[in-house]
Amino acid sequence: KADLYVLTSARTFSGAEEFSYNLQNLKRATIIGETTGGGAHPTNAMIVQHDFILRVPFARAINPVSKTNWEGTGVTPDIAVPAAEAFEKAYALALEKLAAKASDTRLKAGYDWILTGEKAKKNPLRVDAKTLQTYAGEYGERHVTFENGTLFYQRTGPKYRLVPMTPTIFALDGLDDFRIEFVVKDGK
């Protein structure tokens, strides 16, 4: 049994709403996003005049669990977030659950790695310029520079902006599988 997340918005309508509503009432999915549009009844279009169409419901969708439907109210998400944030929220929840269930420590570490990166993207950390400047320097073949309030990393090839995840751990912008930790001892 796998966890299922259904993403919704105010523009989710009709059949997509029925899918969301039914899975929610059967407790088979977690609905994440915005309340849906509220169109449960199928309609037929009737031409009244050449420039006027009337849509009339001809049936009613009734959920066997709730004994009702979402007409006019929409499907209320289990987790309400703006539609633009629904994927990030579902992704983070999936990673958290996978990490919690993982019995293999390497697999758990992998899920935690991704989750830490996603959280850092969502809530960027600010590290003061004075601290950042202390990290600038030569580390063997690796060069860390401080430019316009930002740290950059370069070995050979392109230069990467360093994105703070913690005050001492940084991700390389554009490289999700590489991070740098500055080990500070005795204030250095």
Predicted segments, located by residue:
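Peripheral terminal and inter-domain segments
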Residues: 100-188
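C-terminal "post-core" interaction segments
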Residues: 1-129
